[in-house]
Design a protein with these regions (language model features):
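Glycine-rich loop-to-alpha-helix module at the N-terminal edge of alpha/beta enzyme cores
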Residues: 5-8, 52-139
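Conserved beta-strand and immediately adjacent loop positions that scaffold enzyme active sites
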Residues: 42-44, 112, 144
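Fold-independent oxyanion-binding glycine-rich loops
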Residues: 48, 118, 148-150
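Active-site-adjacent loop/helix segments that line or gate small-molecule/cofactor pockets in enzymes
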Residues: 2-41
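Tryptophan-centric aromatic hotspots in well-structured domains and transmembrane helices
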Residues: 18-20, 62, 86, 144, ...
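Gly/Ser/Thr-enriched, mixed-charge loops and adjacent short helices
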Residues: 153-159
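Active-site and channel-lining beta-strand-loop segments
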Residues: 34-56
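Conserved PLP-anchoring active-site segment centered on the Schiff-base-forming lysine
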Residues: 133-153
Length: 159
């Protein structure tokens, strides 16, 4: 880890004043500073005070499934961001089509992928897809959804 020599008190103050932390009770920040993570490598992260943590959350639930500091991935992403960072899913893109083709080889019996920006969006889209299938094949009579109670499905109202 690179030791941070900069004074991060301004960052901590800005965080405390302006950031709503996901899945957190903010009362605690009245008497203590929020933890500010400044660096990651592999499955480890370091906070502003230099304390090391094993990140057991981001890869399992959020977006860091391959760990931090993966230079080859960062370079590929940077190259694509310069070329074209995003275009609406209502149109095709070169990386989207090529990745879908590759992904389908790992999903026997399926022929299409749907890209979404989050797990919440994916869950809500699959609900709409299932409703459409039910309407087409069962006259709309099948309308129950199975889910695991008290499990994480996303942060939107629908999920």
């Amino acid at each position: 880890m690179n030791t941070m020599t900069n004074d991060l008190s301004g960052v901590v103050a800005a965080d405390r004043a302006h950031v709503w932390h996901h899945l957190s009770q903010h009362k605690q920040y009245e008497t203590m500073d929020p933890r500010v993570i400044v660096e990651g490598k592999g499955l480890r992260v370091w906070d502003a005070k230099g304390k090391e943590y094993i990140d057991a959350v981001s890869g399992a639930v959020w977006t860091v499934n391959v760990g931090y500091g993966r230079e080859s991935i960062a370079k590929a992403v940077a190259d694509q961001l310069v070329k074209m960072n995003y275009f609406a899913g209502s149109n095709g893109t070169v990386p989207g089509a090529l990745f879908a083709e590759k992904l389908i080889t790992k999903m026997p019996g399926l022929s299409r992928v749907y890209y979404s920006n989050s797990g919440s969006e994916a869950n809500e889209k699959v609900y709409k897809i299932v409703r459409q299938i039910s309407h087409r094949h069962h006259g709309g009579m099948k309308n129950k959804i199975l889910y695991r109670e008290r499990d994480y499905h996303g942060t939107t109202i629908g999920t």
